[in-house]
Amino acid sequence: MGRSISVSFGLLVVFLSLSGTGADQDCLPGWSSHEGHCYKVFNLDKTWEDAEKFCTEQANSGHLVSIDSKKEANFVAELVSQNIKETRRTDFVWIGLRAEDKRQHCSSEWSDGSSINYQNWIEAESKKCLGLEKQTRYRKWVNLNCGKPYRFTCEI
């Protein structure tokens, strides 16, 4: 009997260690975890401003996704590719970066206030807001008209 409990406890420990770190449990249902942050692709068409507002309403500290490294860029690209619902509006997906802030000054930070540490621009021409382009498998940043509605990815 004692040995059976010991074996059962041992199997439980092995199962828990194989099931991961539990980081996914920190995310809301339907969100994906990556290096301490949670992400979700929304198949809703919104302007950049409306998408940012929507993200801030999802959870405390929510914003359009900020991409701080190539590793995070690859994670977001895969997440978008796997979760975007194909329509004519899926050529672009908003990210949390604007070429100019609301006061028409050049922005040097993401919508969550973090500094721009990683860049992956595809164009130099500015249309004020940035998104990921399907043609680049959602890996390159492209300038877009802020007033056009596209799908988006939130990060908390």
UniProtKB/Swiss-Prot annotation:
Compartments, record wording: Secreted
Position of the signal peptide: 1-23
Taxonomy of the source species: Eukaryota, Metazoa, Chordata, Craniata, Vertebrata
UniProt similarity note: Belongs to the snaclec family.
Organism expressing this protein natively: Macrovipera lebetinus (Levantine viper)
Further facts: Shows greater sequence similarity to the alpha than beta subunits compared to other heterodimer snaclecs.
InterPro entries linked to this entry: C-type_lectin-like, C-type_lectin-like/link_sf, C-type_lectin/snaclec_domain, C-type_lectin_CS, CTDL_fold
Protein name: Snaclec A5
Quaternary structure note: Heterodimer; disulfide-linked.
GO molecular function, one term: toxin activity
Tissue specificity statement from the Swiss-Prot or TrEMBL entry: Expressed by the venom gland.
